[in-house]
């Protein structure tokens, strides 16, 4: 089909029929009176990707300090009672634990991707630990 040059045309104004304007106005006003505006929702996966980028940029500890400290004390009681911890010792344990978990989740994600999945499963964690030689 040949392309034609568009030229400006002068509009020949005139009044639109009253019935058409009335129906347009009725259509515009109808949904606003009875309808409640739905809250905005992002598409599935958008927020997850945003969180991934946020946590990959950050360096702060992700596990809360007090619950981790209680866990350390609870585990330490099995070996020796009345143990005391310096605050720096608990922080060092937390840094090491989080570094280990991040690495484990990276390997777990690779196992899931290898299985042509995007969701990690317990079997991926088990495989990652088995390959690392942590659990025979």
Curated annotation (Swiss-Prot):
One of its GO terms (cellular component) is nucleus. Signal peptide: none annotated. Keywords: Acetylation, Chromosome, DNA-binding, Methylation, Nucleosome core, Nucleus, Phosphoprotein. InterPro entries: Histone-fold, Histone_H2A/H2B/H3, Histone_H3/CENP-A. Its main location: nucleus. Residues 1-15 have a biased composition (Basic residues). CDD domains: HFD_H3 (cd22911). The modification N6,N6,N6-trimethyllysine is found at residues 5, 10, 28, 37. Belongs to the histone H3 family. The nucleosome is a histone octamer containing two molecules each of H2A, H2B, H3 and H4 assembled in one H3-H4 heterotetramer and two H2A-H2B heterodimers. The octamer wraps approximately 147 bp of DNA. This is Histone H3-like 3.
